Amino acid sequence: MHGREAIEAHYRVAGARMAGLPVYNPALTVELLGWRAVEGVGALGVLITPWCMNLFWQPPADAELPASGERAVLSLPSGDYECTLHEDERLGRHASASLCSPMQDFPGQAEARAMAGEVLRLILAVPEAGPEPSRSGLLSRRALFRRALGGAS
C-alpha cells in the first residue's frame, strides 16, 4: 500500500498542470482523507483536489482485476461501487470513482473535507442487522451524494 503522502505528492504535480484551467478551484488543495487499509479490499480514501473529488482505491497486489482503463467493482458492506482502474509507474495499480467535478461549489477546504468525511462514513458503514439489503445494482454517484446530504436513499 502506498502512503498518503506519496499519493498526495503525485496529485500535487498533476495540479501544477491543472492550475490554469477553469475547473481548478484555487481555494482547495490536494488531500487524501481517511486513507486506510480495509480488510479484504486493499486501501481506500477520498481524494480531494482543486479539480475533482474521487474515491481512491488501491486493491491488494494479488487481486484479479481487468486491465487499466477498464471498470472494476469495489464491494463494501454498504454497497458496490464502480471504479475505473489505473496503472501508474509511481502509484502502481489503483482505481478511482468520481464523486464530484468540478469543485467550484466548495468555497474552501473545510467544506470539501466535510463532504469527503461524510462520503467515507457512508461507504464504510456496516449495515445494521436485519433483512439482507438488495445488491441488485450499483449505488450511483447521485444516490451516494443524496445520502451524504441527508436525503432519502
Swiss-Prot record:
It holds the Pfam family NiFe-hyd_HybE. Coiled coil: none annotated. Belongs to the HupJ family. This is Hydrogenase expression/formation protein HoxT. It comes from Azotobacter vinelandii.
